[in-house]
Structure formats: C-alpha cells, structure tokens
Amino acid sequence: MSNGRRRGFVILIAGVALAFALRALPLYWSSLPSTLDGFDYAWLAKTATETGSLPLTQRADNLVFSTYLSVVSLVTDAVPVRAIQPLATVVGGVICFVGGVVARRVLRDSGSSDGTATAVGAVTATLLAIQGLFLRRTTVPDEEILGILLVITLAFCLHLALRSRLRRWWLVVGLLLVVFPMTHTFSTFIAALVVTALVVRHVSVRLSLRSVLGPGVLAVAFWAYMFSYYRFAESSTTLSVPYVNRVMAYPGLFLAWLILLAIGIVWVQQTGRRVKQISYLAVVGSFFGIVGLNAVSPIFPGTTQTPPLILGLVAILGVFAVTAAFGLELFESYRGGAIPTAMFLAPVTIIGFGLTASLTPEYYDTVMRAQTFLHIPAAMLVGVVLVRLLQAASGSTAGRTLRLGLVALVLVSTVATAPLAYLTMDTATVPSTTYESEFDGVRFASTHTDSPWLSDHSLTRVGANYFKAQVGYSAVANWLSGGPSPDCLVISQRSWTTTGAHLFPNAPETVSATAYAEWTATRNVVYANTGNDPVVVSRPVGNATCAAATNRTV
C-alpha cells in the first residue's frame, strides 16, 4: 500500500470516528430522542416488543425503521425510547462511511489514481461528518436516516448494474426498491428520481432497444409500485401516507419537473464547465436566498422567520457550497460521474417542485427536507477540490501558502457550521432535544389523569406520540398572545419566559417571568420538578370544564 493511500485510509478512519462522536453528542444532554417523531417510533417499537406485532395504525412508511428499532431493543435489552438515539448515532456514522466509500469508487471510475480516489473518499467522509445541516439530519432518530443510507446505496448499486449488467447487482437493486416505500416516503421519491436520472443517462450513452426496455421498464415499474403501495395503504388500511398528497395536488407540475430532470441529467454531462458552474451557483444561491429572505419576512406564510444565529451559520456554509462549484468536472464522466449527478439533480427537482407548487408550510417542509440529499454529492465535489489543491505542483512558497490557506478556510468554515445540528431552529437555542425533566412532566400528566392537557408544540407532540394522550396547544398560544388563561391541565416550562414556547410552524411566544409566576400562583400546581428546564403541571382552581378537550392539534 502506497504512503498516499495509507494516509487516505487513516483520514477516512479518523473522519468516520469523528462522525460517530458528533452524532453521539445529543446523548450528553439527554438519552431521549432528539426529534419529536422519535417518540412515535419508540412507542411503535415498545408496543411491538410487548405484544409481538407492530401496530398498523400509523404511517405506511415507518414499518422498516420501527421493526429495526424493535430488533435492536430486544437484542440489547434496552427500552426503545432509550435505544433509538444511540441507534441513530450508529446509522449516521455509517452514512458518512458509505458516502466516503462511494466517493472513492466514483473517482476511481472517473479515471483518478488510487491514491487520489482514496484521498477524496476520506475527505468526503470527513466533510459529511462535520457539515452542520447534514450532521443535523443524520443525528435525529427517524426513518429518514435509513432512507438517506439506502439512497446512497441504491445509486451506487444501480449504476454498477446498468454498466456491468451483472445479476448480483440487479438482485441488490431489486431488494432495495422493494423496501423503500415501507422505509420512508420522501426518501422513496428521491430514490425514484435517482433511478429515473440514472436510467436516462444510461440510455443516452448506450441507446438501444435493450437499454430502453430493460432499465426503462424498471424505472416505470418502481414509480407504479410506489404509488400503488401508498394508494393501497391509504385506502385499504388504517395507515396514513405523508407527502404523496402534495405531489398529487399538482401532478402536471410534478411531471414537468420530472421531464426537466430527464433533460438535465444529459445536459449537465455534455455542456461546458463554465455553464455548469453558473447553473449550479444559481440553484444553490436560490436556497441561500430563501433562507436570507426568510430572516426578513417568512417566505411561506404562517411559518417562523429564520433566527439571526441560524442565518449566520447557514451563510458560513456558503464557503462549502461555492467551493463545490470548482469540482463540477466530476459530473462529466459517465462511468463515475453519473452517480453524484443523479444524486444532485434528484433533490433539486423536488426543491424546484416545492417552490413552484404552493407557498404553504407543507411545501416549505418539502424544500427543507430535500436539501439534505444535496450535501452528499456536494461533499464529493468539495473533496475533489480540496485534494486537487493539496496535490497541486509545489510552485512558489506563496502559491503553496495560498492553497493551504484555501483548504484551511473550507475546513474551518465547515466545522463552524456544526452547531446547526444541535440548535432548535425556531429559537436558535441549544440543545434541540427533550430533557428528562420535560419527559417526566409529560409522563405525569399523561398517566396520572384521564383528562386532556395543554402545552406548547414540543411537549404535546411527546404526549401524543409516546403516551397517546389527548393534547392541544391552541389555548396556550392564545394565552401567550394575551388571551384568557386555559381552563385545562397545562404543562408549562421556565423556558417560556426566556426563549419562548414552541408553536411550530408559527413563531415562538414568550411570557415575562413575573407574569408566569403570577399565573402559576393562581392555579393549582399538581406536579413540579427541577432540571435544565423545570416543568410545572397545573390545573385551574375550581371545577372548570376543559373547553379544549377536542383540540388535538399537535
């Protein structure tokens, strides 16, 4: 093994170790899930381990992740609600490793030397480990974390299957396509777009009846299977289906973007490098523009504005994004470049659809989720640029210093975005997780009373997802805005007087410490605890009837 290749493997191991460490950091604050959806999967896994069967009363795309969590809980003898965050840590670290391995293969197939390919793979894994937005999405314990891993694997295996026509690769592709709809709906849409892009690119290179019928039928069959599964799940069972209704609301628009994807995958790999760079910067610049404008006024009515701290960290990410523009030659090779090209254009298609469909919180969520998948090919492009700078001919001392300075700038600025993974996006506070004190308060209200209770968005989601409590937060939001005190059991927190109560998708609302103390003094406090964010459970004095009993808006 050459010295360069050995150094590359050392960097890869160090980068993956860093990925695991950063994704384990939420466990420092709490062993509970760092995302509210995680409590729903924990409930599903808990029910499955206790009864021996998975409840078919939730979403149609959480079957694989919930089953996986159930198995891990049984094997480790851990309660699912405590096992889910460590599981996410492991899967998130594996994603970075797989991303690095795929990047190495892409460079090798594009004609780079073994040492260069290994170096790019190592840098890619390290960038994925530390880049703030990607770190955030590969730290939270939900089914998308499996979806991201499967999308990378599918793109790699399908491209090899199309190139080699070997049966073993087609078997792996077939297995992946079967499990996608049951794993994560949004990732399934990304996967379908990746399949479409790779098939179109393959046909454009090897135009023949065989190339059109074989891979073309596969792409059409997967789209048909995906929609058929979700239609069956929605109409024939008690399972719910997210995201699909957003596409079906504008089918013509989605088809138009699908056609643009098919044209784009061929155009990108045949057009000039300067045109590609301008087009890339326009696409990426639109994302930064949206975040910036949202800091002034919500782009999507009814959603919260971007906090200044979040805006600053995202702006720093611009160094990473601009650097990627100088590695776009990676898109030019069919043998290797088709993989990152398809993985880039697939989420761009979803982002374009979301921005042109409707200015609503649902489509805002669609755009934000799609950008996660952009970071994988972008990290490969940045890896190419950094390795090129490091391997450039020595030249003058000033030239070497400049190149090392540019590499340091990219790495330091990327590390500086890491806090994005741990911040609560609407309040820009750390950590973005559920404290033990919060969970204890929710457990008390949910298990010691049969009556409905109220709180902010975060705590009501925990109650509804894990304890299946009857909850709501509209009356609390009304009180925080100057309305009457809620006539129900309320879980309140000290943070309501500082960072505010979470009322997603609306902006947080605060109450003064004095007003909060006076309010709790006028109610019967039935539970209180201490901790990082003390919780108080109180009910109104007298025999007030909870008017919000039917309010289940969570």
Where are the model-predicted features located?
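Membrane-embedded transmembrane-helix bundle of lipid-linked glycan/lipid transferases
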Residues: M1-D426
